[in-house]
Curated annotation (Swiss-Prot):
Its main location: cytoplasm. It comes from Bacillus subtilis (strain 168). Homohexamer; trimer of dimers. GO terms for cellular component: cytoplasm. Pfam families: Alpha-L-AF_C. It is found in: Cytoplasm. It catalyses: Hydrolysis of terminal non-reducing alpha-L-arabinofuranoside residues in alpha-L-arabinosides. The gene is abf2. This is Intracellular exo-alpha-L-arabinofuranosidase 2. Keywords: Carbohydrate metabolism, Cytoplasm, Glycosidase, Hydrolase. Disruption phenotype: Cells lacking this gene retain 70% of arabinofuranosidase activity, and the double mutant abfA/abf2 is inactive.
Length: 495
């Protein structure tokens, strides 16, 4: 008998995996927007109306469902009117003390979303803004015609209003968004959200600024005071192997201890979702309010020689395992977790893409998103996994995790992670209810070294490969996983 056992009920769905779990986040931070996404129409780098063509095409492959902007901490010092029409510069006080040109504003962001065919998720300014400013931004974007803001939008080149589905009322108002107490922010949220009105057939999904990590009191206060006025409540949690203030650890030069600690801290998101979810259930037993994990991912020390305020870090196979582990946990909580936005899309923190001048590379995290996109809006299949332990220095974690989903046409996708940096894993999976698969295939992302990563000189060092180390006999699936690996198995429906 294999050391790892699992049962997948191929005909029992536990819920739907909201595609928005695979959302993204792009902040005016470092080279995340400028140089990363936006190069301007005068750039020698190929672009579409100022947006980098290579980055755009790569992001399209991910089927990004939703993109959060302009922050982050930047959102609570962003004054949207400076980014339309005649642009006004400002100081980005949060991230590197740089001058923000506001060249990339509302029109450019909405154009990006249209090109990506994704929903915009805009975060409004509560920390330093006003109710009127937020109200006028909504009017500018979504009112058809005949008002000062809608007429200004038309003067600036956009005739038709945009569709705006998601709007966040402030960001991290417990910290960079104003250092508020939850009671104070709850009252502000109630006030500000009143003026996030629905125009032109819009039905805006309002997201309240939620807790940092394990601040369960914040969640309790917000749900008690404002649950009926919100559609979603956010949660922020970063995977940091070290200490946030004293040293987070290197993205590439790390020890075996740090590998294990990183995996352990990644798994902590499961406990956080359960505990915040239990509080939300107290005030929202029908689970109408979504838990929106709109900032998550690894956070390491910046790369040496870069501006520390730019949060530029490399991305290894370790990051890939962190991403895959998060997705498996998000899937299991798909009733409550309705959106998640990794930080961030390009050149910042756990990025999909890194750029350097004209050059671009895809990170191991990008490849996980690309492999896992098959789970978007699919039915989560009931799965029970009996994993052997991944042991390190007297501590243990489950060595493997498995998630399975079924698409509308009947194809079944199974993703498996082996987080052990040293040991392979052999798993035996019973596929109950499976009669026959017309075809099957496998893809694997792995590496020989735990700090393996892509560079501009070797951009394909870590990439997905065809995977054949498995057998399927009737309804028995046997899989051999190397250390540090993420596998996707697809069983195509017999038509």
């Amino acid at each position: 008998m294999s050391e790892h056992q699992a049962v997948i009920q191929t005909d029992i769905a536990k819920g739907t995996i909201n595609k928005n779990i695979y959302g993204h986040f792009a902040e005016h931070l470092g080279r995340g927007i400028y140089e990363g996404i936006w190069v301007g129409t005068d750039s020698d780098i190929p672009n579409i109306n100022g947006i980098r063509k290579d980055v755009l095409e790569a992001l399209k492959q991910l089927h990004i469902p939703v993109l959060r902007w302009p922050g982050g901490c930047f959102a609570d010092e962003y004054h949207w009117a400076n980014g339309v029409g005649d642009r006004k510069t400002m100081l980005n006080t949060h991230w590197g003390g740089t001058i923000e040109s506001n060249e990339f504003g509302t029109h450019e962001f909405m154009m990006l979303c249209e090109l990506l065919e994704c929903e915009p998720y805009i975060c409004g300014n509560v920390g330093s803004g006003t109710v009127q400013e937020m109200s006028e931004w909504i009017e500018y974007m979504t009112f058809e015609e005949g008002t000062p803001m809608s007429d200004w939008r038309k003067q600036n080149g956009r005739e038709e209003p945009w569709k705006l589905k998601y709007f966040g009322v402030g960001n991290e108002n417990w910290g960079c968004g104003g250092n508020m107490h939850p009671e104070y922010y709850a009252d502000l949220y109630r006030r500000f959200q009143t003026y996030v009105r629905n125009y032109s057939g819009n039905d805006i999904y309002k997201i309240a600024g939620g807790a940092n990590v394990d601040d369960f009191n914040w969640t309790d206060v917000l749900m008690k005071k404002a649950a009926g006025l919100m559609d979603g409540l956010s949660l922020h949690y970063y995977t940091i192997p070290g200490d946030f203030w004293k040293g987070k650890g290197s993205a590439t030069e790390f020890t075996e201890d740090e590998w294990f600690i990183t995996m352990k801290k990644a798994k902590y998101i499961d406990e956080l979702i359960q505990k915040h979810g239990t509080i939300m259930d107290r005030y929202d037993p029908e689970q109408r309010v979504g838990l929106i994990i709109d900032e998550w991912g690894t956070w390491f020390d910046p790369e040496p020689g870069t501006n520390p305020g730019f949060l530029y870090q490399q991305n290894t196979i370790r990051d890939a395992l962190v991403a895959a582990s998060h997705f498996h946990i998000f899937h299991q909580h798909c009733r409550r977790v309705q959106m998640a936005n990794i930080a961030q899309t390009v050149n910042v923190l756990q990025a999909m893409i890194l750029t350097e001048g004209e050059r671009m590379l895809l990170t191991p995290t990008y490849h996980v998103f690309n492999m896992f996109k098959v789970h978007q809006d699919a039915s989560l299949l009931a799965t029970e996994t009996m994993s052997a332990d991944y042991e390190w220095n007297g501590e243990t974690l489950p060595q493997i995790s498995i998630s399975a989903s079924k698409q509308a046409e009947g194809d079944i996708n199974i993703t498996i992670c082996n987080i052990d940096h040293q040991n392979k894993a052999e798993a035996e999976i019973e596929l109950r209810g499976l009669h026959k698969a017309a075809d099957h295939s496998g893809v694997i992302l792995t590496a020989e070294k735990m700090n393996a990563h892509n560079t501009f000189d070797d951009p394909h060092h870590v990439k997905p490969e065809s995977f054949r180390q498995y057998t399927l006999s009737k309804n028995k699936l046997k899989v051999k996983l190397p250390p540090m690996s993420v596998v996707l198995l697809t069983l195509r429906a017999d038509s």
